[in-house]
Amino acid sequence: MAAATGAVAASAASGQAEGKKITDLRVIDLKSELKRRNLDITGVKTVLISRLKQAIEEEGGDPDNIELTVSTDTPNKKPTKGKGKKHEADELSGDASVEDDAFIKDCELENQEAHEQDGNDELKDSEEFGENEEENVHSKELLSAEENKRAHELIEAEGIEDIEKEDIESQEIEAQEGEDDTFLTAQDGEEEENEKDIAGSGDGTQEVSKPLPSEGSLAEADHTAHEEMEAHTTVKEAEDDNISVTIQAEDAITLDFDGDDLLETGKNVKITDSEASKPKDGQDAIAQSPEKESKDYEMNANHKDGKKEDCVKGDPVEKEARESSKKAESGDKEKDTLKKGPSSTGASGQAKSSSKESKDSKTSSKDDKGSTSSTSGSSGSSTKNIWVSGLSSNTKAADLKNLFGKYGKVLSAKVVTNARSPGAKCYGIVTMSSSTEVSRCIAHLHRTELHGQLISVEKVKGDPSKKEMKKENDEKSSSRSSGDKKNTSDRSSKTQASVKKEEKRSSEKSEKKESKDTKKIEGKDEKNDNGASGQTSESIKKSEEKKRISSKSPGHMVILDQTKGDHCRPSRRGRYEKIHGRSKEKERASLDKKRDKDYRRKEILPFEKMKEQRLREHLVRFERLRRAMELRRRREIAERERRERERIRIIREREERERLQRERERLEIERQKLERERMERERLERERIRIEQERRKEAERIAREREELRRQQQQLRYEQEKRNSLKRPRDVDHRRDDPYWSENKKLSLDTDARFGHGSDYSRQQNRFNDFDHRERGRFPESSAVQSSSFERRDRFVGQSEGKKARPTARREDPSFERYPKNFSDSRRNEPPPPRNELRESDRREVRGERDERRTVIIHDRPDITHPRHPREAGPNPSRPTSWKSEGSMSTDKRETRVERPERSGREVSGHSVRGAPPGNRSSASGYGSREGDRGVITDRGGGSQHYPEERHVVERHGRDTSGPRKEWHGPPSQGPSYHDTRRMGDGRAGAGMITQHSSNASPINRIVQISGNSMPRGSGSGFKPFKGGPPRRF
């Protein structure tokens, strides 16, 4: 106790008093002052200032100014957010050497006190003493220029110290198998669990901030510095607290590095076991970590500022690493997990806090028992921790602190939940200042309601799962310590082997194997060869299991790599290692001596045998290493071949895809070409069809035009024929049957009776003898070509006017309506007998008769304008002519009908064959069917003009003078289109019977009608043979 008091005085003497305004103080300083006065430190800055002013006024001081002691022991505050830590560290970074010296003195006193407490901790205290010396040297070195290098060396030295501490702990565990060791092992197991939470938790709490060895080293150095700074920060609280904090902080250092060493030496099988036990333990395991958190929270609340000051002063590089990690942390997650790198809140936060809780539990045990052993301290520590279950999810640590603060002083309060199952129940860990307060809180608060939830409050002491884990961790730590003892002796050989790291992970695995082999071999030294071989097989199994674990969990892989990298870093040789090397060599020498004594006791082996055994072990190790390298090489070769095959396969697949793509493109081009050709064919086909349709339409149009033209020509012919027929004289063929026909003809030859159509002057019977029907005055205006020898033009001069007037008058009633149309008895199909034999003689007779008539004077007939008009009333009207009596004419008509009853049918059929309109053709049938006897004058030239200049004289057949005149009954011909031909006048009915020659021989009694285009050749308006008399001769 005296030593502790001296330490407090020394640390207080090292502080510097400084007067400041309260308003200028930082929140952390305000909380520190409030905590010194045992006041509430919750609230914002204004609340804290008002509370502090009130306290100072009560003390009688100046409420505006305060005397602030800036030293290592000043801050006794609750941990603040990361930003506050950064600012605080920056401000305190200037006083590194002064406070470091004070801290070293404190640590020396505390180490001496701790050494008095436990006789078995001598070696540990000496190590801590050396560590403090190293820290002193380190703090001076960090002020020099080579900060990074010394940071690495510091971390290496710390790793070695940790191994030595583990050895000492294992010795303690072997020596004492009491509850103290169990508790330490339990703490160790908890640390391992925390490391597992960080390294292998499913929610990725192991961040990438520590893959690099340098970063990890900085974090480790930072963590170690924090742990060492914890020792001197509780001076204002109590001296006993200071002592216990020093020891427990160092224990925490040892325990924290135990997990790393487990990973380094390949014995992470223990981690797997504890990890496997964690899910089974369930909520108990969760309960342990909150307990640890609460303990650690308490310690950090008391001593955080001292830690930060020395850390910042110690190493700017460490400060940067710590600050970056502080930014990642949220709220009041503690700094001692910075060696694990910045991690997200959640499971990593629990892991961080759990390591602090383990230290805090030790602190509280030392508080209760003072200078008693850590055995009694461990049992006492659990009495200060309260486990609160059944909290609602919105409960905060401040709520717990306020609630439990009613029944005592609350050192720390934590609210924890199971990060692996979000949404699970919340639990609370509250650390009270004494066990009496714990029992008071339990008595008052158990089964009460908080935030609508019923909470249960109980001590953390009797946790069954904790005991199980203590046992497991006890076993693990004992086996680990024995392995680590041996591992230190062969450390140099391992580092040499690790220099050949071709691929980092493979070489590290082989180094793990080497370390296991080393442990096994040195185990042989202690025991016998059988034991060694058993240990070897056990270590091989462990290494395989470790490989499995590392391959399954990427978090474990990261930690294995980085810990091995830190552990086996061959290039680290610095002052710190040299400083520490002497103490390590001494320890190794003492251990070797102990082993030699044990060997001598068991079996005194000659030196040669020992050398052979060592050589064998080395050979075995090298053989294993060679096998491992060979296996790795084979794996690499296999992997290379697999990659090559995969590459070739990918290349082939790509080539095949490209080939298929090219083929598809080619086929697509072909398809497009075929499509274009098909479309071109379709287009040509459509064009062809269109052209054919156009041709067909054109042909149809031409045919329609031709038909129209033909119809128009036919209509024109019909019109002309009708016009000409209206101009023609009335046909009086029936007068051929008149008894006076032959007698009067010659008498009236010179008259104009054939133009008069029944004029008053008398007509001779033979007036047709010299008359050519083709030259008849049908066209008196233009008859230019005439074959008669006398001047016929003179005869037409007086009559032309009257004849011109006829057609207009006669057109009043169409000619085809004038006569009944009889189509019933068509007899045109009978070919008439040929009449060629009569032609020559008839021609002579006609010429002779014409000559006889040349001197006949043609009289005018002014009184007759339309001689045929009276006939329109009936089919056979009486004629107005006076040269023959009406009675004789009608008598002749009747006789003619009797003699030739079939003529009208023939005539109709003959006309219809010629294609004229049937009405026109049959219009003359009212004359007793005598139309067939009428000759039709037609143009031989085939033209449609029916005027004399186009007419040619048709050779008249000579008429038979000896035959009766009445039998010559060829009707006067008309133009080719005038099928409704009219009978000529009485005087020329017989003489006008001329026939027209066609290309073929026409029947005797018909005049062939040759129309221009429409009349078929050889189908003239044929004359039908007489039935009642001899054939008619022309």
From Swiss-Prot:
Residues 102-127, 135-155, 220-237, 270-283, 290-339, 354-370, 458-529, 539-548, 563-599, 718-757, 769-779, 790-872, 891-909, 947-969 have a biased composition (Basic and acidic residues). It holds the Pfam family RRM_1. The modification Phosphoserine is found at residues 93, 97, 139, 144, 289, 421, 550-551, 553, 748, 789, 800, 815, 909, 923, 929, 944, 998, 1002, 1014, 1019, 1021. Residues 384-462 form the RRM domain. This is SAFB-like transcription modulator. SMART domains: RRM (SM00360), SAP (SM00513). The modification N-acetylalanine is found at A2. The modification N6-acetyllysine is found at K401, K1024. It comes from the Eukaryota. GO terms for molecular function: RNA binding; sequence-specific DNA binding. The modification Omega-N-methylarginine is found at R1017. GO terms for biological process: apoptotic process; regulation of mRNA processing; regulation of transcription by RNA polymerase II. Residues 91-101, 156-195 have a biased composition (Acidic residues). When overexpressed, acts as a general inhibitor of transcription that eventually leads to apoptosis. There is a cross-link at K500, K884, K1024, K1027 (Glycyl lysine isopeptide (Lys-Gly) (interchain with G-Cter in SUMO2)). Keywords: Acetylation, Apoptosis, Coiled coil, Isopeptide bond, Methylation, Nucleus, Phosphoprotein, Repressor, RNA-binding, Transcription, Transcription regulation, Ubl conjugation. Residues 55-242, 268-387, 456-599, 713-1034 are annotated as: Disordered. SUPFAM superfamilies: RNA-binding domain, RBD, SAP domain.
